[in-house]
From Swiss-Prot:
Alphabetic keyword roster: NAD, Oxidoreductase, Tricarboxylic acid cycle
One function term, GO molecular function aspect: L-lactate dehydrogenase activity
Protein name: Malate dehydrogenase
Active site: 176 (proton acceptor)
InterPro entries in UniProt: L-lactate/malate_DH (IPR001557), Lactate/malate_DH_C (IPR022383), Lactate/malate_DH_N (IPR001236), Lactate_DH/Glyco_Ohase_4_C (IPR015955), Malate_DH_type3 (IPR011275), NAD(P)-bd_dom_sf (IPR036291)
UniProt binding sites for substrate: 83, 89, 121, 152
Catalytically driven reaction(s): (S)-malate + NAD(+) = oxaloacetate + NADH + H(+)
Gene this protein is translated from: mdh
Function, in words: Catalyzes the reversible oxidation of malate to oxaloacetate.
Binding site for NAD(+): 10-15, 34, 96, 119-121
Amino acid sequence: MARNKIALIGSGMIGGTLAHLAGLKELGDVVLFDIAEGTPQGKGLDIAESSPVDGFDAKFTGANDYAAIEGADVVIVTAGVPRKPGMSRDDLLGINLKVMEQVGAGIKKYAPEAFVICITNPLDAMVWALQKFSGLPAHKVVGMAGVLDSARFRYFLSEEFNVSVEDVTAFVLGGHGDSMVPLARYSTVAGIPLPDLVKMGWTSQDKLDKIIQRTRDGGAEIVGLLKTGSAFYAPAASAIQMAESYLKDKKRVLPVAAQLSGQYGVKDMYVGVPTVIGANGVERIIEIDLDKDEKAQFDKSVASVAGLCEACIGIAPSLK
C-alpha cells in the first residue's frame, strides 16, 4: 500500500515541527513547501537525516512550487506572518488573507481531494477564507484551534490538581482568540466535573477563573516570553492529532474550527465546536446544551469572528 502524502504549506517553526512529528508517527511521506528557497529543502533534509536515529521511514521533500503538493491526502497550512509581542491575532488579518488566497489557489489546483487543516491566524477568519478560495467542501477544511486551547486548559488544570494530564478532559468552544469560551461545566478530572471539584475543596472558583483566563491568554503568554515569534510545539502536535484521526479513520472527538450550517444558531461561519473527525473529514458536529452565561459568551465569540469575516470581505470582495 502506498504511503499517505502530507503537504505542509509553510516551513517555519510550526511547519518544521509538523514534518518531524509526521515522520516520528510514520503518518506518511512529507512535502514541505515554502516561498523561501532553501528553507523547506534544508529542513526536510535535516529531519530525514534524523530518521535512522529515531527509526522511522518517511520521505521528506522540500519545494518552492505548489506542483509538489499534487495528490496530497492531508494539507496543513501554516503560511503567513506569526504574531509579535503587542500584536493581536486580528492584526495579522490583511497580510495573511493575501497568503490564504494564494494557498487556496494552489490547493484547488493540485490537492482538491485533500483534508485541509489551517493553523494561520486569525484562525477562524483565515480558515473561512481558505475554504472559499480553495472551493473544497466545508467538511474537508478545518481550523486547528480547539485542540490546542483545550490542551492548554488541560495542562493548567493538571498543574493545579497535581494529577496526570491524561486524566483531565477540557472543553473550549468559540473563536480562537481572546473571546474563546473554556467550559468548566463540561471539563473533568477522571470524570468529575470541575464545579464538583470546587465543591469538594480541590480548588477555588477564583483559582479556576484565573486558569480560564490564562487559557484565553495562552498564546499571548508564549509570544511575550519568546519575543521573536509564537508557539509552535503545541500547535503542531494539535494539528498532527487531527491529521492522524483523519488518516486512520479514528473518529476522535476533537474541538476544531468547523463550518456551521445552523448548529448553535450559526450559519456559513467557522467557529470552534466539538466534532468527530474520521475518513470523511468532519463527520459530525456535536451540539451541546449551553446555559445562559455560556451562550452569551459563545455569542460574543461568534460576533467577534463575524467581524473578522466582514473585514476580510472588505479586503477581498470575492469572498462574499
